[in-house]
């Protein structure tokens, strides 16, 4: 009978566990606890004289047993916390059973019954050993003011500053070799840069790019730029020369034009004077005055020189 009930309970739990194949440890723990309760219910049914049981009945009894045990634990925890304790004791469980209407005096006789079935412990499967994580340094223990149930400190390298730097080299020979190699590298880099950006000469006529040499350039006099006029000064000098030339040509053209007009006017005046001799006296007085301002000779402005203080 026990085998039949156990088979029914195991079959139900096996179907349940088979339908929920989970790799989560919490889910596996709940499935194992449920299966253990089903085995206990099957053994109780066998002690009561049942030879077989339906799956729904076994599940209902399992749920009732689980709820009963959960209520005992919850009530014991509440009584424990009311007395300012964190862990329940036997007295808390006894008070809980009494409050739930259970006769505590019948427990010793029930534990010593003759038809008691011994449930063997389930086989323990060796869990795969997880490799330990790589640790750097030694873990720091808790100080006296931190309770032991607090989590441990993480690895020291996660929160302790560990600067990594090389010690400076102080050997004289090593420093000289390092300085020489750096100077040689800088010279090579500068030579390559000058060969790529400037004019070069080659030792071989056939292959120009094999051994490029920097073309020699004559040295310029450093103070020559200060002696030579700048572009702005040259431009100003050119503008001044061009303006003087324009003024000179304008003056020459104006003088030529005036002379031509004077000659024409003299011819006209002579012809008029020959016809009217009375106008000759008044015309001679007006010859020295020019009414047209554009025909007057150019007068340069007077340059005012500053008196030097002696």
Swiss-Prot record:
SUPFAM superfamilies: Histone-fold. Coiled coil: none annotated. Belongs to the TAF8 family. One of its GO terms (biological process) is RNA polymerase II preinitiation complex assembly. The modification Phosphoserine is found at residue 271. It is linked to Neurodevelopmental disorder with severe motor impairment, absent language, cerebral hypomyelination, and brain atrophy: An autosomal recessive disorder with onset soon after birth or in early infancy. Affected individuals do not show developmental progress, are unable to sit or walk, do not acquire speech, have poor visual fixation, and show poor overall growth associated with feeding problems. Additional variable features include seizures, spasticity, and joint contractures. Brain imaging shows hypomyelination, thin corpus callosum, and cerebral and cerebellar atrophy. Component of the TFIID basal transcription factor complex, composed of TATA-box-binding protein TBP, and a number of TBP-associated factors (TAFs), including TAF1, TAF2, TAF3, TAF4, TAF5, TAF6, TAF7, TAF8, TAF9, TAF10, TAF11, TAF12 and TAF13. Interacts with TBP, TAF1, TAF6, TAF10, TAF11 and TAF13. Component also of a small TAF complex (SMAT) containing TAF8, TAF10 and SUPT7L. Forms a heterodimer with TAF10. Interaction with TAF10 is mediated mainly via its histone fold domain while interaction with SUPT7L is via its C-terminal region. This is Transcription initiation factor TFIID subunit 8. Ectopic expression of the histone fold domain acts as a dominant-negative mutant resulting in differentiation inhibition. One of its GO terms (molecular function) is RNA polymerase II general transcription initiation factor activity. It is found in: Nucleus; Cytoplasm. The TFIID basal transcription factor complex plays a major role in the initiation of RNA polymerase II (Pol II)-dependent transcription. TFIID recognizes and binds promoters with or without a TATA box via its subunit TBP, a TATA-box-binding protein, and promotes assembly of the pre-initiation complex (PIC). The TFIID complex consists of TBP and TBP-associated factors (TAFs), including TAF1, TAF2, TAF3, TAF4, TAF5, TAF6, TAF7, TAF8, TAF9, TAF10, TAF11, TAF12 and TAF13. The TFIID complex structure can be divided into 3 modules TFIID-A, TFIID-B, and TFIID-C. Gene3D superfamilies: Histone, subunit A. Residues 35-102 form the Histone-fold domain. The keyword Isomerase does not apply. A motif (Nuclear localization signal) lies at residues 294-307. The modification Phosphothreonine is found at residue 130. Residues 297-310 have a biased composition (Basic residues). It comes from Homo sapiens. Induction: Induced with triglyceride accumulation. The keyword Acetylation applies. The modification N-acetylalanine is found at residue 2. CDD domains: HFD_TAF8, TAF8. 'Taube nuss' means 'empty nut' in German. The lineage of its organism: Eukaryota, Metazoa, Chordata, Craniata, Vertebrata. Its main location: nucleus. Residues 270-283 have a biased composition (Polar residues). Transmembrane segments: none annotated.
């Amino acid at each position: 009978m026990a085998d039949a009930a156990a088979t029914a309970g195991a079959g139900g739990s096996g179907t349940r566990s088979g339908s929920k194949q989970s790799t989560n440890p919490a889910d596996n723990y709940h499935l194992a606890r449920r299966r253990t309760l089903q085995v206990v219910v099957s053994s109780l049914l066998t002690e009561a004289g049942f030879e077989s049981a339906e799956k729904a009945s076994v599940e209902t009894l399992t749920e009732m047993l689980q709820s009963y045990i959960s209520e005992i634990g919850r009530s014991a925890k509440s009584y424990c916390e009311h007395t300012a304790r964190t862990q329940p004791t036997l007295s808390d469980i006894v008070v809980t059973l009494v409050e739930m209407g259970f006769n505590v005096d019948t427990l010793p006789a029930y534990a010593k019954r003759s038809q008691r079935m011994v449930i063997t412990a389930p086989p323990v499967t060796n869990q795969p050993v997880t490799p330990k994580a790589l640790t750097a340094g030694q873990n720091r223990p808790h100080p006296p003011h931190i309770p032991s149930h607090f989590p441990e400190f993480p690895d020291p390298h996660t929160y302790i500053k560990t600067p990594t730097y090389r010690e400076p080299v102080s050997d004289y020979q090593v420093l000289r070799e390092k300085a020489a190699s750096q100077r040689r590298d800088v010279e090579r880099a500068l030579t390559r840069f000058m060969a790529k950006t400037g004019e070069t000469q080659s030792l071989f006529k056939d292959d120009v790019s094999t051994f490029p040499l920097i073309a020699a350039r004559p040295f310029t006099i450093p103070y020559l730029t200060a002696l030579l006029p700048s572009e702005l000064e040259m431009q100003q000098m050119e503008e001044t020369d061009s303006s003087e030339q324009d003024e000179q040509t304008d003056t020459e053209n104006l003088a030529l034009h005036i002379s031509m007009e004077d000659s024409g006017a003299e011819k006209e005046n002579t012809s008029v004077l020959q016809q009217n001799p009375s106008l000759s006296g008044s015309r001679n007085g007006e010859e020295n005055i020019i009414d047209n301002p554009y025909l007057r000779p150019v007068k340069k402005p007077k340059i005012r020189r500053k008196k030097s203080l002696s």
